[in-house]
């Protein structure tokens, strides 16, 4: 079975003094006994020279019923990123980046490269390759994991509104199970955003 993630059921992005705040809710359907809800908030900024950064806090539903949204919040780690966006022209950009995600039990290092083409009518397409290297410093007996991940996006901007579809395919090169005892996983994400401040 594939994993279905629906991000931003009630998410929004807005700009305030050139800073973007992104709120997301995520539901992951991993089968009959593996459903989870998670939330995140990130703050990001991109400077005129193309350099950008973001800081993200995460939490999830805990306790006896993780499939219940907003139930017994527990920490779910944090993530920081730096990127540099190079624009070949007004439509095409290339963005290398590096993310670090960590929680109490693991750290994930995520070098990545994204390309995007934006059409003049508001439609855009993008793709990203990311290599996720996971280490478990709190558990010396657990092997590291290495994952090759590909993302594809298609989106549309209309005024202050933006909608986006995202497909993710990730495969462990170490044979670590991701979904249904398979070394790969798939996600389908939907995002709707509204700009509150011009």
Predicted regions located by residue number:
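Cleavable N-terminal export/targeting peptides
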Residues: 1-20
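Short glycine/proline- and aromatic-enriched beta-strand/turn motifs that initiate or cap beta-hairpins
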Residues: 16-67
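Repeated loop/turn-to-beta-strand initiation elements of outer-membrane beta-barrel proteins
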Residues: 19-22, 49-55, 87-96, 121-127, ...
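Transmembrane beta-strands of outer-membrane beta-barrel pores
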Residues: 25-31, 57-63, 98-104, 129-135, ...
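Extracellular loop and loop/strand-boundary signature of outer-membrane beta-barrel proteins
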Residues: 27-29, 66-70, 100, 112, ...
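Residues that define the transmembrane beta-barrel architecture of outer-membrane proteins
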Residues: 35-39, 43, 74-80, 107-111, ...
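Residues on the lipid-exposed face of transmembrane beta-strands in outer-membrane beta-barrel proteins
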Residues: 41-45, 80-86, 113-117, 129, ...
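Outer membrane beta-barrel transmembrane domains
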Residues: 162-198
